């Protein structure tokens, strides 16, 4: 059964590629252009997973997931970072903020889907 997944990335091409991959796997996809924009999806969307970039304008991925984790309904929803960032310090900061996993761009669609299967029940 498909899951409801929010993709947050300031790159339209990344949003479209990820969306295409997930929709072809049977998932329902919502898209936000940055953390600030994506906050609107937290009320009433019943998300199963959030996939977010780290570096975005207006509100970056770390600040975004801190906002997500502050909502009672989203304290345990998995959050994957999909980013070009590979620094260990950033990964630790993301984990401390509430990230579930980390995927480096460019990504292989099959590996993205496998990562999703690991974190979404």
Predicted feature locations:
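Active-site residues of response regulator receiver
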Residues: 53, 83
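Charged docking surfaces used in two-component/phosphorelay signaling
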Residues: 16-24
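Receiver (REC) domain active-site loop signature in two-component systems and cognate sites
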Residues: 56
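Active-site beta3 strand of CheY-like receiver
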Residues: 45-51
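Short, glycine/charged-rich "phosphate-handling" switch motifs in NTP-dependent
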Residues: 100
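C-terminal output helix
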Residues: 107-116
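Short hydrophobic/Thr-rich beta-strand motif most characteristic of the beta2 strand and flanking loop
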Residues: 26-33, 41
């Amino acid at each position: 059964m498909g899951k409801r997944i929010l993709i947050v990335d300031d790159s339209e091409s990344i949003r479209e590629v990820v969306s295409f991959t997930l929709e072809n796997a049977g998932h329902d996809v919502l898209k936000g252009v940055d953390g600030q924009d994506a906050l609107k999806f937290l009320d009433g969307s019943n998300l199963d997973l959030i996939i977010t970039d780290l570096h975005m304008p207006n509100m970056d991925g770390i600040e975004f997931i801190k906002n997500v984790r502050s909502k009672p309904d989203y304290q345990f929803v998995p959050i994957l970072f999909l980013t070009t960032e590979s620094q260990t310090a950033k990964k630790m900061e993301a984990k401390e903020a509430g990230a579930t996993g980390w995927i480096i761009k460019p990504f292989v669609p099959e590996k993205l889907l496998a990562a999703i299967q690991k974190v979404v029940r």
